[in-house]
Amino acid sequence: MGSFSIWHWLIVLVIIALVFGTKKLRNVGSDLGSAVKGFKEGMKDASADKPADQVTQQRVSDDTIDVQAKEKSNS
């Protein structure tokens, strides 16, 4: 009783095809496919834009900070 057999699924599919019609089901399938395709393209665009947004910082070793400059001038 837990899972349905293949015959149960075939009967359900036939009933759905009779209720909605094959043309309507084809339109739903193509809409779903285009939505998945658009989602995948959006994910590719988002991952391609991510490295461009990151700013690289360079560290210079001999720079002084204001606190260090103030301490040097007081000494």
From Swiss-Prot:
Function: Part of the twin-arginine translocation (Tat) system that transports large folded proteins containing a characteristic twin-arginine motif in their signal peptide across membranes. TatA could form the protein-conducting channel of the Tat system.
Family: Belongs to the TatA/E family.
Chain's gene name: tatA
Location(s), subcellular: Cell inner membrane
Membrane topology: Single-pass membrane protein
A GO CC term assigned to this protein in UniProt: TAT protein transport complex
Molecular function as annotated in GO: protein transmembrane transporter activity
Segments for region (Disordered): 45-75
UniProt-recorded name of the protein: Sec-independent protein translocase protein TatA
GO biological process: protein transport by the Tat complex
Highest taxon, organism lineage: Bacteria
Organism field: Bordetella pertussis (strain Tohama I / ATCC BAA-589 / NCTC 13251)
PANTHER family: SEC-INDEPENDENT PROTEIN TRANSLOCASE PROTEIN TATA
Keywords associated with the record: Cell inner membrane, Cell membrane, Membrane, Protein transport, Translocation, Transmembrane, Transmembrane helix, Transport
Matches recorded under Gene3D superfamilies: 1.20.5.3310
One Pfam family linked to the record: TatA_B_E
Membrane-spanning segments: 1-21
Summary of subunit composition and partner proteins: The Tat system comprises two distinct complexes: a TatABC complex, containing multiple copies of TatA, TatB and TatC subunits, and a separate TatA complex, containing only TatA subunits. Substrates initially bind to the TatABC complex, which probably triggers association of the separate TatA complex to form the active translocon.
